[in-house]
Amino acid sequence: MKIGSIGYNHVHDMKYENFIMDRPKGPGAVLLLLIKTPSVFRVGGVQYQVKENSFILMSADTPCYYTAQEDVYTDDWVYFENGYWDKEYVEKLGIPMDIPVYLGDIDELSHLVHILVYEHYSGAVNSEEIEKKYIDVLFLMPVSY
């Protein structure tokens, strides 16, 4: 699997912006979100009240909508390149697609995303290989919760 773009600890304060992510045709690529604040999600026509410290792995073409449930929406996000997405690997691990999952504690996962942000944008020697290893860890961690 390969990262297309990635972001760490993005905060949207609803006092200053009306943050709504509305993608009726889906996000365009597989999207992993680590959700850090209570949120409202509608994925594939099903609405969810999502607790903080949850994650969701959304399919590229599943319609989705999400926003803050309160004053702030915060998440880490990872878009995966479509040509490199390994659906069989994720299915083998038993990670659900298009359904929010409450983990209780996402600090380690969020820290890993922070490291991945650096690796992805650094262009350092071997960063692509290092990134691949961290992606494996990223998908193995939720399975261990």
Can you say where each PLM-predicted feature lies in the sequence?
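Short, solvent-exposed positions on alpha-helices
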Residues: V125-K133
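Short, solvent-exposed loop/helix junctions and linker helices
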Residues: K25-G26, L103-I106, K132
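A hydrophobic/aromatic-rich effector-binding and dimerization subdomain
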Residues: M1-K15, F55-V125, F139-S144
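Hydrophobic alpha-helical segments that form the core
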Residues: K132-L140
